[in-house]
């Protein structure tokens, strides 16, 4: 990282170089936008992508946090808009005959496709292909799609951007009636990205709206369709839980501090497992953990653990924002008593152990199997003591 970098990402510990590309498929709201992290070949020329893709995301982030969109958006853009990810932008994909396991990742409220880059980079360095979906249900800080400007079909020069802002709950609206349709749309978007990547791995042509990106044909034969997991944070955690039930190709789900509220009550008898709930100390409620326990009671391989000293945003990249000015906008909600780098390491190891077990990986991640049971640094099984009488 350069001296001016105001986001200091955790060091990568896996053996693979990491590539990264953006994929937009389709010319309508029903299409897909995601950021793909993957093992790549070493390359002498290595352009690094921006962490926050464009200025509009800085404005959207300020708006989501309920700051002045214009001025604080400008401040965010100046402070963190030039930060780059330590990966190879559109780096050459490293083919693997047996295929890489695939993870589809769903962001939380106010997130976007790069909000969990620390997790994505580390998992890609460990030999996973990770697709971070940018949802179009208006839960993202900002997002967009490219649509034709006229009735003519598809030349790139005839496309125009349509931006979708974050949608707030209006006065008098019942939040569940907004969030429940959103979580179902989110699942459809996750499944669509799964299908796109399976098509690419099968050698089918996938047209990327973005020019000059990674040729997805290079993924041919390199994704293991039998080893697929879904993962998400907060609203994305609920999305992952629902996606596991609705799409049988997902073999397991990882729910980081899942916000269970959007899921309808009659969903729980139908819920599938295994789900790995990784909570932080001070976000969950008794009711929310009770709902997680309903799923665990039905599926003996599902687990709940809590990371002590971590807070809700400890599981996002915003935990790694540094510098007095910008960090103030996140510090009250993104800094727990546990060092964010220690928190990240503990969670990654727990995730790897869970994935090894349930995707039948031939790795050494079982050295952290105890983490799945809440036995490890800063971990406890189940809920914190003040929620333990459930």
UniProtKB/Swiss-Prot annotation:
Keywords: Cytoplasm, Endoplasmic reticulum, Hydrolase, Lipid degradation, Lipid metabolism, Lipoprotein, Membrane, Myristate, Transferase. One of its GO terms (cellular component) is cytoplasm. Transmembrane segments: none annotated. Monomer. Pfam families: PAF-AH_p_II. A lipid is attached at residue 2 (N-myristoyl glycine). GO terms for molecular function: 1-alkyl-2-acetylglycerophosphocholine esterase activity; platelet-activating factor acetyltransferase activity. It comes from Mus musculus (Mouse). Catalyzes the hydrolyze of the acetyl group at the sn-2 position of platelet-activating factor (PAF) and its analogs, leading to their inactivation. Hydrolyzes propionyl and butyroyl moieties approximately half as effectively as PAF. Also catalyzes transacetylation of the acetyl group from platelet-activating factor (PAF) to lysoplasmalogen and to sphingosine, producing plasmalogen analogs of PAF and N-acetylsphingosine (C2-ceramide) respectively. Has a marked selectivity for phospholipids with short acyl chains at the sn-2 position. Belongs to the serine esterase family. This is Platelet-activating factor acetylhydrolase 2, cytoplasmic. Gene3D superfamilies: alpha/beta hydrolase. The keyword Zinc-finger does not apply. The lineage of its organism: Eukaryota, Metazoa, Chordata, Craniata, Vertebrata. It is a lipid-anchor.
């Amino acid at each position: 990282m350069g001296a001016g970098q105001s986001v200091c990402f955790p060091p990568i510990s896996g053996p693979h170089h990491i590539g990264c590309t953006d994929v937009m498929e389709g010319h309508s709201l029903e299409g897909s936008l995601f950021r793909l992290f993957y093992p790549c070949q070493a390359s002498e020329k290595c352009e690094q992508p921006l962490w926050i893709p464009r200025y509009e995301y800085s404005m959207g982030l300020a708006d989501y946090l309920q700051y002045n969109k214009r001025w604080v958006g400008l401040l965010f853009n100046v402070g963190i808009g030039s930060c780059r990810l330590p990966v190879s932008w559109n780096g050459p994909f490293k083919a693997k005959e047996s295929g890489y396991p695939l993870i589809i990742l769903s962001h939380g409220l106010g997130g976007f496709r790069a909000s969990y880059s620390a997790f994505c980079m580390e998992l890609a360095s460990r030999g996973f292909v990770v697709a971070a979906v940018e949802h179009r249900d208006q839960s993202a800080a900002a997002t967009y799609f490219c649509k034709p400007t006229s009735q003519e079909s598809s030349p790139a020069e005839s496309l125009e951007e349509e931006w979708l802002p974050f949608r707030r709950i209006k006065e008098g609206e019942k939040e569940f009636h907004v969030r429940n349709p959103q979580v179902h749309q989110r699942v459809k978007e996750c499944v669509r990205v799964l299908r796109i990547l399976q098509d690419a791995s099968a050698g089918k042509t996938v047209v990327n709206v973005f020019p000059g990106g990674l040729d997805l044909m290079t993924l041919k034969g390199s994704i293991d369709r039998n080893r697929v997991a879904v993962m998400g944070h907060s609203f994305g955690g609920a999305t992952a839980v629902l996606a596991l039930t609705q799409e049988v190709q997902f073999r397991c789900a990882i729910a980081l501090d899942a916000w269970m509220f959007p899921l309808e009550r009659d969903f729980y008898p139908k819920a599938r497992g295994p789900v790995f709930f990784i909570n932080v100390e001070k976000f969950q409620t008794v009711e929310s953990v009770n709902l997680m326990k309903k799923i665990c009671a039905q599926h003996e391989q599902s687990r709940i653990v809590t990371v002590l000293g971590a807070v809700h945003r400890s599981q996002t990249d915003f935990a790694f924002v540094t510098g007095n000015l910008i960090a103030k906008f996140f510090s009250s909600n993104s800094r727990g008593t546990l060092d964010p780098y220690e928190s990240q390491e503990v969670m990654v190891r727990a995730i790897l152990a869970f994935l090894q077990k349930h995707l039948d990986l031939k790795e050494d991640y079982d050295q952290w199997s105890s983490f799945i049971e809440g036995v490890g640094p800063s971990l406890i099984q189940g809920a914190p003591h003040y929620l333990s009488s459930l």
